[in-house]
UniProtKB/Swiss-Prot annotation:
Its cofactor is Zn(2+). L-glutamate binds at residues 9-13, 45, 172, 190. PANTHER family: GLUTAMATE--TRNA LIGASE, GLUTAMYL-Q TRNA(ASP) SYNTHETASE. The keyword Cell inner membrane does not apply. GO terms for molecular function: ATP binding; glutamate-tRNA ligase activity; zinc ion binding. Catalyzes the tRNA-independent activation of glutamate in presence of ATP and the subsequent transfer of glutamate onto a tRNA(Asp). Glutamate is transferred on the 2-amino-5-(4,5-dihydroxy-2-cyclopenten-1-yl) moiety of the queuosine in the wobble position of the QUC anticodon. Zn(2+) binds at residues 101, 103, 115, 119. This is Glutamyl-Q tRNA(Asp) synthetase. Pfam families: tRNA-synt_1c (PF00749). It is an enzyme of class 6 (ligase). Belongs to the class-I aminoacyl-tRNA synthetase family. GluQ subfamily.
Length: 293
């Protein structure tokens, strides 16, 4: 069997129910993958147990199913991958490519707000604390398929960033890179809240000698300027009983033509057939009230 040339994914965290912003990200990545005759995977990013809501993972998967957003293969849960993350961290430390750091946010703020690598220069080495990667591949720009050229602050790009937190939890940057590489993701389609983080992920991909995926960052759904819909600010869950209206609303948000109201499977088939990347607004955020203005 010839492997697909395109593999995309939707990777929500189980911190609550899917809301309209989640639907936009899920639908955008689904349409992009299927328009490329590719695969669309689902991964549950459950590496932050204190923020998890009991039952949220099952609720998310049921909601995707109710919307006809059926995934290829089995769902990957990041908690299944803890040993992989730990093995990579230990390999980094053994090669002096990572080190322990005990600097607090207050210490970093008093030294200009950017971590200066001081713990990486200590002798003898620290043996506990957060763990930072030695950032030997400094990435301060990349080209996004929708947003175009993206440039981040040089100090941010050069910083040795955390790959395991001081509380023992694995950092998102490490987990997402190892998982995207493991699943063979060829393009990451997600919201613009992670636009700058892509530079750190490209850095990690390169240091690990993996080929970075392409990047396509969708505009964020905002209730008002600078205030995105999120589970943390109690954005309402999307309707799983009558999903058709929400599907067309999400298509409109993404600059796509509405589809005929039918079963969700028929609606998504039509949406894939008429999907046009060039009509998605190349904006970092869109306030909901302005869509039909």
């Amino acid at each position: 069997m010839i492997p697909p040339s395109y593999i995309g994914r939707f990777a929500p965290s189980p911190s609550g129910s899917l809301h309209f912003g989640s639907l936009v990200a899920a639908l955008g990545s689904y349409l992009r993958a299927h328009s490329q005759q590719g695969q669309w995977l689902v991964r549950i990013e459950d590496i932050d147990p204190p923020r998890e809501v009991p039952g949220a993972s099952d609720n998310i998967l049921r909601t995707l199913d109710a919307y006809g957003l059926h995934w290829h293969g089995t769902v990957l849960f990041q908690q299944q991958r803890y040993q992989v993350y730990q093995d990579q961290i230990e390999a980094f430390i053994a090669s002096d490519l990572a080190y322990y750091c005990q600097c607090t946010r207050k210490i970093i703020q008093t030294s200009g707000g950017v971590y200066d690598g001081r713990c990486g220069r200590l002798q003898p080495r620290l043996t506990h604390g957060a763990i930072r990667i030695r950032n030997h591949v400094k990435v301060d720009h990349f080209v996004d398929k929708l947003q175009g050229p993206v440039v981040v602050d040089k100090a941010f790009a050069e910083e040795d960033f955390i790959i395991k937190r001081s509380d023992g939890l694995y950092a998102y940057q490490l987990a997402v890179v190892l998982d995207d590489a493991y699943q063979g993701i060829t393009e990451v389609v997600r919201g613009c809240d992670l636009l700058e983080a892509s530079c750190r992920q490209i850095s990690l991909f390169t240091q690990l000698e993996f080929t970075p995926p392409d990047w396509l960052h969708l505009p964020l759904v905002c209730a008002e300027k600078g205030f995105k819909l999120s589970k943390q600010n109690y954005a309402p869950a999307i309707d799983v009983i009558h999903p058709q209206a929400s599907i067309n609303a999400a298509l409109t948000f993404l600059g796509q033509k509405a589809v005929d109201v039918d079963s969700v499977e028929v609606m998504l088939k039509q949406a894939v057939e008429q999907f046009d990347l060039s009509t998605i607004p190349a904006q970092k955020e869109i306030v909901l009230s302005t869509i039909n203005d």
